[in-house]
Amino acid sequence: MSTVVWTPLGEADLPDLRELALACLRADGGLPQLADESMLRRLFLVGAGIGGRDETGDLVAAAAVRLEGPQARSATGLVRPSARYGGLGRQLAAWCAERAGGTLLRVVVESTSPQTESFLAGLGLEPTFAEHVMRHDLAEVPRVRRPAGMVSLPWSEDTATLFHRAYRASFAERPGFPDPPLGAWVRGLVEDPGFRPERSRVVLDREGRVAGFVTLSDCWLDQVGVVPRWRGQGLGGHLVARSLRAFSRAGCGEAWLAVGVDNPAHDLYRRLGFLDAGLRSRWERAVPGEGDLSS
């Protein structure tokens, strides 16, 4: 069994962290931004981080614990596919539990495999959030006509209120809906450097009432919503198909989205040509102390 040397993570480890993340994404799928420098820095370098290197110097495992609130700590970790099943995962979990105050309470997983799910469940953690990550190659972009009588408007300072109204009307019925006020919601969009207002759309019906909306960033469908009275009439399909054409015209080689595992829109996206490209998830401990690996 090879020897792994553990050392703290730092800026100099970013290239190797990226290569490790890419290896995990190739094996398990998941959120492609996991390999972006900005996300790796946020996940592994903001708090305390540790990396394990084998006898050749390759980074085979990494983990970190960071604060996500006054007392809330989250852990994340990666193990190279070729180095799994040798106990590295349990070593990382024990290290994270110690840094988190003795008990591992919350884990962020942007590249989730069945083995990861089984491992985390064995630690006494339960999934609290999970999304399908989906990809469209844009080779064949469908066309779905907008329902008759509707008007589509791009994002602007004047239409931002309509977008927010459509967002609330589309999602307010969901359990745990956060319902952010207009100002906070708008800032969350426009402060994202990838946000593409010229490609985003809000749709109004004949009476001028909001019927649905879509917000886009780079080559991602961020949010797609249809108000309840307009569901099942092709508006959601139109918003997605129109967005795919916008991505294609902008030079995107592929389009991405993430959708909750229990969201029926998953079937719509598959009918429009999206394919599943992995899972991302969040895990939390149901019973404090259960599965503690710190001792």
Feature locations, PLM:
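Active-site/acyl-donor-binding loops of N-acyltransferases
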Residues: 122-142, 241, 252-295
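Conserved hydrophobic/aromatic pocket- or pore-lining residues that grip, position, or stack substrates
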Residues: 163, 203, 243
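Short amphipathic alpha-helix that is part of the acyltransferase structural core
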Residues: 1-36, 145-179, 209, 294-295
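A structural microfeature
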Residues: 61, 129-130, 211-212, 236, ...
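A mid-sequence, solvent-exposed acidic-amphipathic segment
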Residues: 171-208
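Acyl-donor-binding surface of acyltransferase catalytic domains
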Residues: 67-74, 79-150, 281-285
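Conserved donor-binding loop and adjoining core beta-sheet/short helix segment
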Residues: 9-14, 21-102, 106, 206, ...
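Conserved acetyl-CoA-binding loop-helix of GNAT-fold acetyltransferases
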Residues: 85-98, 226, 232-249, 266, ...
